């Protein structure tokens, strides 16, 4: 078993949501294992980052990779889009998986998006789920989607091809509320 590479970033300005402070950051492999002042690790590569800002990985909660719309496809697929995200400091993207109209299931929509993303992403990724058709099957699938890691659901009130009627909109919101979404 190979050892992981340790890196010690010294004297960087660590920026969090509510403060910034000069600290050291010890990284073991791909994990931050310690943040503090005057850290030492004799087996680590030391990098002086004095005067540099150290941010946690950013989250982009609204991406549209490999999306077919209006007779074209968005410029980035999951490979190029996540590479660009990483270059800009984003370590998690959340794209929109979508159920297709015409009797298609949420599961089919999620699987379609996983096929586009799995094995192609350079960063962590997740999905929102777009619900465009409400029926008994879709209602039964909500819990399964939550179990699959879906934490947010998108409902359209514009775009005629994606919109659900007001009665279904109410039913969907009521059902999602039962699950705490």
Language model features: what each stretch is:
Residues 2-57:
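Histidine-rich, glycine-flanked metal-binding segment
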Residues 12, 30, 51, 62, ...:
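Divalent metal-coordination and catalytic microenvironments
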Residues 15, 21, 71, 99, ...:
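Short strand->helix junction
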Residues 50-120, 137:
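Metal-associated gating/positioning segment near the N- to mid-region
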Residues 99-111, 116-181:
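Histidine/acidic-residue-rich, glycine-tolerant segments that coordinate divalent metal ions
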């Amino acid at each position: 078993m190979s050892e992981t590479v340790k890196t010690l970033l010294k004297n960087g300005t660590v920026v969090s949501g509510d403060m910034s402070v000069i600290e050291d950051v010890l990284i073991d492999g791909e994990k931050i294992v310690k943040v503090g002042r005057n850290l030492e690790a004799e087996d680590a590569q030391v990098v002086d980052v004095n005067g540099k800002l150290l941010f946690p990985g950013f989250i982009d909660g609204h991406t549209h990779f490999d999306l077919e719309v209006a007779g074209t496809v968005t410029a980035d697929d999951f490979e190029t889009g996540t590479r660009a995200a990483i270059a800009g400091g984003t370590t998690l993207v959340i794209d929109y998986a979508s159920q297709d109209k015409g009797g298609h299931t949420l599961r089919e929509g999620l699987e379609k998006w996983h096929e586009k993303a799995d094995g192609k992403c350079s960063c962590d990724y997740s999905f929102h789920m777009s619900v465009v058709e409400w029926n008994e099957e879709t209602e039964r699938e909500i819990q399964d989607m939550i179990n699959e890691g879906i934490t947010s659901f998108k409902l359209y009130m514009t775009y005629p091809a994606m919109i659900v009627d007001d009665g279904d909109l109410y039913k969907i919101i009521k059902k999602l509320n039962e699950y705490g979404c």
